[in-house]
Structures are given as C-alpha cells and as structure tokens.
C-alpha cells in the first residue's frame, strides 16, 4: 500500500521505528518549543498532507510513553484522517499530567496507523418491529462488573 504525502520544507515522512511497528511516527512541525500546561489542549501541525487510498483511513494514536510518563494524550483518540481529506494533518494533544510538557521541534508526537474502512448501509426500522433481542440488551457502561 502506498500513501502519497505532500511535505512542507524540512518535514520528514512518517516512519516506522521498528520492523514490526503498526504505527508510523508523526513529528511536530514547529519552529520553537511549545509548552503544554496541565489541563491544556493544543493543536500541533505535522507539515504533512496525505492522499489515502479509498477504502482506508489513517488513525492518529497517542505514543504510549507520553501517556505513561507525562499524561500527554491525543484527545480524540484515535483521530481519523479520511481518504478524501487533503488538508494538513494536525494532532490535538492534551496534558492530563501535573506538570508543563514541552513539545520540541521535530519531536515524535503521535503515531499513524493505516486501517481498512467499511462503509455500512444504515436502515431505519419501525420501533414496533424493532431490533433483534440479545441477552445483553441495552446494558452498557460497566455492566459486566469491575473484576
């Protein structure tokens, strides 16, 4: 699979850190360090525009080390880059940690994971006819317990 990328000057292509990596690293395309205060959200540019093949998406996911060590997360994780989007890929990062986090120029800030997409046909049904029943029904949000 090939994804065409239009890069701003000095920007690198997304790179897989290891042979078995699922996510390719995305880097911050900023000129100066950017401080992210506790509780703050920031939009970080990557300097990359992508042409994703129809039937696929690119999911933007957080880096696990950022989450564990600093409380830095991709807010809308996974973020979706649709096949028909041609704008710059930007990453929404939030600091859920207790101290200010500094994003340095060209720092790896997120991962891009390519995934297939299926577009479903949604059909409305009459409420009397309804949906088929299951043993779970409408129970959700922790209904299976905490252990």
UniProtKB/Swiss-Prot annotation:
Substrate binds at residues 63-65, 76, 80-82. Its EC number is 3.6.1.23. It is an enzyme of class 3 (hydrolase). SUPFAM superfamilies: dUTPase-like. InterPro entries: dUTPase (IPR008181), dUTPase-like (IPR029054), dUTPase-like_sf (IPR036157), dUTPase_trimeric (IPR033704). It comes from the Bacteria. GO terms for biological process: dUMP biosynthetic process; dUTP catabolic process. Pfam families: dUTPase. Keywords: Hydrolase, Magnesium, Metal-binding, Nucleotide metabolism. The keyword Coiled coil does not apply. Belongs to the dUTPase family. This enzyme is involved in nucleotide metabolism: it produces dUMP, the immediate precursor of thymidine nucleotides and it decreases the intracellular concentration of dUTP so that uracil cannot be incorporated into DNA. This is Deoxyuridine 5'-triphosphate nucleotidohydrolase.
């Amino acid at each position: 699979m090939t994804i065409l990328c239009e890069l701003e000057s000095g920007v690198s292509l997304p790179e897989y850190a290891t042979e078995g990596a699922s996510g390719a690293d995305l880097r911050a395309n900023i000129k100066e360090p950017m401080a992210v205060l506790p509780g703050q959200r920031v939009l970080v540019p990557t300097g990359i525009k992508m042409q994703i093949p129809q039937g696929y998406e690119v999911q933007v996911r957080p880096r696990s080390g950022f989450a564990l060590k600093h409380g830095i997360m991709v807010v809308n994780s996974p973020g979706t880059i649709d096949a028909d989007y041609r704008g710059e890929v930007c990453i929404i990062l939030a600091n859920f940690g207790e101290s200010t986090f500094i994003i340095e120029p060209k720092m790896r800030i997120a991962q891009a994971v390519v995934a297939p997409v299926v577009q479903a046909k949604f059909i409305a049904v009459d409420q009397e006819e309804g949906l088929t029943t299951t043993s779970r029904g409408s129970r959700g949000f922790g209904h299976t317990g905490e252990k």
